[in-house]
């Protein structure tokens, strides 16, 4: 199912935080939002899973304006892993994941065999097949993250919206998560701070800066040294990954990009001396 965000504008507390954003995620495509902190990534995602309502523009999912759908219709199309994640569920892991089946159930309807199989598959997919009876509130941050992803998968949506899905995960589970998302072949819109993970996972990247979209395209075309310097304020080389051939960003941690806050501060200090 295709996502289209058209001329999106979002205002919070009277301040425009996202303006004029237009992007598309084609059916089956993994589209990544990248940008510095405060660039508007989470705000854009929140309009897709209806946590925020646009001030102007619209979000189309499968050709329908997301705000025109009922909550159940929306939940059958879009499942989200937001940054606003509950951590105090006094429920078992399995019960939390089974919540993903709610959009398909009538009031007071019980779980059927198909539901049970979907929940089991979702737990297995995130490596938690043996954790069904554990209490969600007793889990580590990384384990909770994986349970909530399993809940989104159990929802069996057309579209996944994931806000920093690799947060709190160790390296092994990050790699497994990226492989799982690739294998899903499901339209996915996600934000990532790790630019190398974004370059490896995403079919297309959309770069946000100051609430505006400044670049879109395949990772190899978007993640240039010039853009990394201008948007992220870092000096870097982009090479081929020796194992996968994906773009690999090698950051220069010693020398700031010209014009970056660090470079300006160092230049000012040198001038003062």
How would you label these PLM feature ranges?
Residues 49:
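Helix-to-loop junction immediately C-terminal to a conserved catalytic motif
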Residues 160-164:
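Catalytic Walker B motif of ABC-type/P-loop ATPase nucleotide-binding domains
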Residues 229-273:
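ABC ATPase nucleotide-binding domains
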Residues 57-65, 74:
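Conserved ABC transporter NBD signature motif
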Residues 34-36:
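The feature captures the beta-strand-to-loop junction immediately N-terminal to the Walker
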Residues 154-158:
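A short, proline-enriched helix->beta-strand linker immediately N-terminal to the Walker B motif
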Residues 3-5, 18-20:
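Conserved structural motif at the start of ABC-family nucleotide-binding domains
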């Amino acid at each position: 199912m295709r996502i289209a965000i058209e001329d999106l504008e979002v205002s919070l507390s009277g301040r425009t935080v996202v303006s004029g954003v237009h992007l598309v995620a084609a059916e089956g495509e993994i589209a990544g939002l990248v940008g510095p902190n405060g660039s508007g990534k989470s705000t854009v995602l929140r309009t897709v899973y209806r946590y925020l309502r646009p001030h102007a523009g619209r979000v189309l999912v499968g050709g329908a304006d997301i705000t025109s759908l009922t909550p159940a219709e929306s939940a059958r199309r879009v499942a989200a892993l937001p940054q606003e994640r509950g951590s105090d569920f006094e429920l078992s892991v399995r019960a939390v994941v089974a919540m993903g089946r709610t959009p398909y159930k009538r009031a007071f309807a019980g779980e059927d065999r198909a539901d049970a199989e979907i929940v089991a598959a979702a737990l297995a997919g995130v490596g938690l097949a043996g954790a069904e009876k554990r209490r969600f509130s007793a889990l580590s941050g990384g384990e909770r993250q994986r349970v909530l992803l399993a809940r989104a998968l159990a929802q069996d949506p057309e579209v996944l919206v994931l806000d920093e899905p690799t947060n709190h995960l160790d390296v092994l589970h990050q790699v497994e998560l990226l492989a799982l998302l690739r294998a899903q072949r499901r339209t996915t819109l996600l934000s990532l701070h790790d630019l190398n993970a974004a370059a490896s996972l995403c079919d297309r990247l959309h770069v946000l800066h100051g609430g505006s979209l400044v670049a879109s395209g395949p990772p190899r075309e978007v993640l240039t040294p010039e853009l990394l310097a201008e948007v992220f304020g870092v000096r870097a080389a982009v090479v081929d990954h020796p194992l996968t051939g994906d773009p690999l960003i090698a950051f220069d941690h010693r020398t700031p990009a010209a014009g970056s806050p660090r470079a300006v501060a160092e230049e000012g200090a040198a001038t003062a001396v």
